[in-house]
């Protein structure tokens, strides 16, 4: 897993998980603001622009983040925030380790299965997945 870091290493740690089709740069502006008071960690989720591997599952990303926090921050950080896909990964993290962070911000997580749209979503993902690694497409999506 590749991570971007902002701020001094002796500060409270905030980890922000970007949404699908986005990447670490989604939080670049807010990280510049937070870095004077916090150490900000921005993991690049698997399969997204700048990552070192293909996306496999929410669970594997969650396990990788738990391992990263265990290995680098003694198993606990101040806050983890997640947007969309990042929020779903965060929910999986919290279901496995509810004490991994003092605070959690969950934005736009899919928490109730939508059975009727699963087939449509699968088709659309298969058609558009190649665009997820294109930075120009991610930035265009972010602007909307």
Predicted regions and their residues:
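Helix-loop "lid/cap" segments that line or gate small-molecule binding pockets
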Residues: 109, 136-144
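Active-site micro-motifs of SAM-dependent methyltransferase domains
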Residues: 22, 47, 87, 111-112
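Structural signature of beta-strand start/N-cap positions in the alpha/beta core
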Residues: 13, 39, 77-79, 102-103
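Active-site loop/oxyanion-hole signature of alpha/beta-hydrolase fold enzymes
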Residues: 41-81
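Conserved HGGG/HGGXW glycine-rich cap/lid loop of the alpha/beta-hydrolase fold
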Residues: 6-52
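Gly/Ala-rich beta-loop-alpha elbow adjacent to hydrolase catalytic centers
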Residues: 82-90
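Flexible "cap/lid" loop of the alpha/beta hydrolase fold
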Residues: 95, 101-132
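Active-site signature of alpha/beta-hydrolase-fold catalytic machinery across serine-
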Residues: 29, 92-96
């Amino acid at each position: 897993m590749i991570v971007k870091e902002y701020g001094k290493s002796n500060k409270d740690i905030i980890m922000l998980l970007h949404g699908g089709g986005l990447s670490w740069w989604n939080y670049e502006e807010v990280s510049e603001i937070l870095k004077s008071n916090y150490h900000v960690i921005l993991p690049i989720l698997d399969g997204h622009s700048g990552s070192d591997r293909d996306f496999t599952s929410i669970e594997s990303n969650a396990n990788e983040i738990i391992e990263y926090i265990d290995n680098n921050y003694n198993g606990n950080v101040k806050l983890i925030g997640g947007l969309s896909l990042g929020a779903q990964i965060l929910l999986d993290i919290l279901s496995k380790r509810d004490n991994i962070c003092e605070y959690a911000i969950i934005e736009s997580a899919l928490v109730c299965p939508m059975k009727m749209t699963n087939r449509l979503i699968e088709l659309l993902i298969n058609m558009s997945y190649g665009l997820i690694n294109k930075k120009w497409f991610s930035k265009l999506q972010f602007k909307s």
